[in-house]
């Protein structure tokens, strides 16, 4: 096991700049750094929604294959979001990115890709019902999932494998 450190806290005055840095590192495709900075912000400002959203996105940026551990961590953060709309929308985003991670694996994982994308569409439908006027982000994501399912010819997996009779 590695060495144990006591993490240092940033000052309240540094929160806004730290959130900017987290967003910057995420856009530079450095999700681990964005995750770390977001956690530092949330340690001193647990109600900082922007830092929480960046954390969720940074965790989903790290999905490979199913990304189950990162997905659980992302979903834990989703439950802390303030509105039902955000909870539904970002739960959809987590499911969508899990599905897309499965899709990138190919082979049998494609059936899991379908499930992730279909689950995302369900969350996006719920978010769409809760949206503010003029905010169609959930529709845009729903359409992207639908297009991927159709383009890739994804199908749900069979629950019961067929028995081979000889």
Feature annotation, model-predicted:
Residues 2-17, 79-80, 111:
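TPR-adjacent "capping" and linker segments in tetratricopeptide-repeat scaffold/adaptor proteins
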Residues 13-40, 105-108:
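Alpha-helical segment of the N-proximal tetratricopeptide repeat
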Residues 44, 80-81, 130:
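Structural marker of alpha-solenoid helical repeat scaffolds
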Residues 13-17, 45-59, 83-106, 136-148:
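Amphipathic alpha-helical repeat scaffolds of TPR domains
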């Amino acid at each position: 096991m590695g060495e144990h450190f006591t993490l240092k806290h940033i000052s309240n005055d540094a929160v806004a700049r730290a959130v900017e840095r987290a967003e910057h590192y995420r856009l530079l495709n450095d999700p681990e750094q964005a995750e770390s900075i977001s956690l530092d912000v949330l340690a001193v400002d647990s109600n900082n929604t922007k830092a929480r959203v960046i954390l969720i996105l940074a965790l989903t940026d790290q999905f490979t294959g199913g990304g189950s551990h990162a997905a659980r961590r992302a979903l834990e953060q989703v439950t802390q979001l303030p509105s039902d709309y955000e909870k539904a929308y970002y739960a959809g985003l987590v499911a969508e990115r899990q599905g897309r991670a499965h899709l990138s694996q190919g082979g049998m994982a494609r059936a899991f890709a379908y499930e992730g994308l279909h689950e995302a569409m369900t969350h996006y439908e719920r978010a769409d019902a809760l949206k503010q006027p003029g905010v169609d982000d959930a529709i845009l994501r729903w359409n992207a999932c639908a297009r991927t399912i159709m383009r890739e010819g994804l199908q749900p997996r069979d629950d019961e494998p067929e028995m081979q009779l000889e």
